[in-house]
């Protein structure tokens, strides 16, 4: 039965979320016929949404009406029909309905190309990827006011089909606000905008603008670190966020301001000896848990460094699974900043001997800047997955199938070791750029197409290909600077 549906994997999660958004859009349309709805970035286990009611503010009563309508749609368990249209007709229809960004996206496609339209009780919209068969499958959601809009909160694959406890995340919201300012500066809000610029030969200029904006933000962080006399900079974020490149660029900016090169180190060099690595629930070594770090040694060495003492920083030998000493004996110079990058950097247990006022915490993630249209956007998780897939193939010899197989375990580890500590950050850095998915497509598309139908990862590969087909390719160009975060994934200039 539909009401018994449960999210079992990330393909299910994406389908559930798309279906819930469709139900939400239908409900808003039913309650406020002429309202203009925008689905924003993912936030607090859900999606931030803004409803334009023609000048008046959204009220608690309005939200109750929308929630009640959603519950009725779900209880009715209406079939979601996938209709097929031509790109030409779809473009004409969306233009007549006042959705120019949807219309332009389809107008760019071959006229006779098939476009899928999701239909729910006479309401139609493009969701670009997988859907559940009926509205009754969405058996759990939460709708609550947030800032000038509301949050549609949903279960996911990592929390056993439950909605995690709500916690406000001001820093992440502020980072999304910065994304909106960047979009306004570049004039690129939707996918059709960047596709148009690519076709007009302006890709290099978009790359330069995006990289300049990102560099300016890193400069501001460095200025804040120096002005506030911070002694330790802690950088953390989920897989494929671009932590290593960001840490190096922060170091370069601090050196520019102070004339002193920060002391940079990664927590990976402080792993316990491999035989002492704790086991996870699956009985295999858990290299991502805090127990895999030699906390006693790390804290002692950080305390000694800040006291001006000489320290023998280890270098971890990943082949033999042991720390090697004697290669990096150093001490902090006067006013030299210590920059630490690693999974657990925002967890205060890692640096419990360092006073909070001496720390500057940076949470980094590729918060997606580009929206497909006002109702659809590339998720942050998918943005990171594309990065990881390309990097795994470029530098580690893994195919896309192997990356997809490993991804659930990676995300499960992040939900325990990284995301719970993101709200403790002083700043959130968005490591994505508006052009990156268009460029990553050049590398990722052939990898995904190579996954055979017999593979257990075939459905997930097809889901990604479904939405990625609307992104025009940017071939790797020299316009991407050597220190760009994207270079961490696509490789150096040739």
Residue locations for each model-derived region?
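Conserved lysine of the Walker
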Residues: 243
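Auxiliary tRNA-acceptor-end handling modules of aminoacyl-tRNA synthetases
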Residues: 2-15, 27, 36-216, 221, ...
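Conserved nucleotide-sensing/catalytic segment adjacent to the nucleotide-binding pocket
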Residues: 263-265, 272-321, 337
